[in-house]
From Swiss-Prot:
Induction: By retinoic acid.
Signal peptide residue numbers: none
Protein name as it appears in the record: Lysosomal-associated transmembrane protein 5
Listed transmembrane segments: 19-39, 64-84, 92-112, 134-154, 184-204
Subunit structure: Binds to ubiquitin.
Family in the record: Belongs to the LAPTM4/LAPTM5 transporter family.
UniProt keyword annotation of Phosphoprotein present: yes
GO cellular component, one term: plasma membrane
């Protein structure tokens, strides 16, 4: 084994990076196809968000961009699968870039889930300012930090295929509507823990793909170096081909002795 290959780890937390990356690529390809089918069925059945008669230019642009994005997700996932199978490290770069963007959007989604908390803290700071163990300045500072998070969450106005609240069909995003304060806080804590767990898993999968990229790149560089050092092999001509070749006897020189059987 080449010493450079030994420096690249082929496992990540007891999992082979090539197997994990291949499984991830197959999963993304299947999910892209299912997402395209689901979106097409919604448009065909004329859901409220997809009726052409009720949408303007913005809704039409949003619908077209949704299909374009799903198609790009499928192409990038297929590129990842081809890159792993055929050892083309460059085909892994689009997926790595997509994962970075997806991770940033997930962070903004997590920050956007705290958009309703500043109002609770303001109410608590006004009603419990005298009996609270925390100083009012601390509560105001925390409220200011959460307001900054709210400002960051304003950049979540992305198309509907990436809008977290528009995809909240199962109501797994905590909301303060018809929910007591204590229950809402508990739901936010559970939601944050679960979402952070998902982010950690995304980082782990990104690490697997990155190590697979380095491994394939190192393997290709070793193979190219090995091929460059190989000597060119020349195949000798047969007897008939040698007789048909022009004579290399210099002009005026002695002719070679005739061939004779012993």
């Amino acid at each position: 084994m080449d010493p450079r290959l030994s420096t690249v780890r082929q496992t990540c937390c007891c999992f082979n990076v090539r197997i994990a990356t291949t499984a991830l690529a197959i999963y993304h390809v299947i999910m892209s196809v299912l997402l395209f089918i689901e979106h097409s069925v919604e448009v065909a059945h004329g859901k409220a968000s997809c009726k052409l008669s009720q949408m303007g230019y913005l809704r039409i642009a949003d619908l077209i961009s949704s299909f374009l994005l799903i198609t790009m997700l499928f192409i990038i996932s297929l590129s990842l699968l081809i890159g792993v199978v055929k050892n083309r490290e460059k085909y892994l770069l689009p997926f790595l870039s997509l994962q970075i963007m997806d991770y940033l959007l997930c962070l903004l989604t997590l920050l956007g889930s705290y958009i309703e908390l500043p109002a609770y803290l303001k109410l608590a700071s006004r009603s419990r300012a005298s009996s609270s163990k925390f100083p009012l300045m601390t509560l105001q500072l925390l409220d200011f930090c959460l307001s900054i998070l709210t400002l960051c969450s304003s950049y979540m106005e992305v198309p509907t295929y990436l809008n977290f609240k528009s995809m909240n069909h199962m109501n797994y995003l905590p909301s303060q509507e018809d929910m007591p304060h204590n229950q809402f806080i508990k739901m936010m804590i559970i939601f944050s823990i679960a979402f952070i767990t998902v982010l950690i898993f995304k980082v782990y999968m990104f690490k697997c793909v990155w190590r697979c990229y380095r491994l394939i790149k190192c393997m290709n560089s070793v193979e190219e170096k090995r091929n460059s050092k190989m000597l060119q092999k020349v195949v000798l001509p047969s007897y008939e081909e040698a007789l048909s070749l022009p004579s290399k006897t210099p002009e005026g020189g002695p002719a070679p002795p005739p061939y004779s059987e012993v």
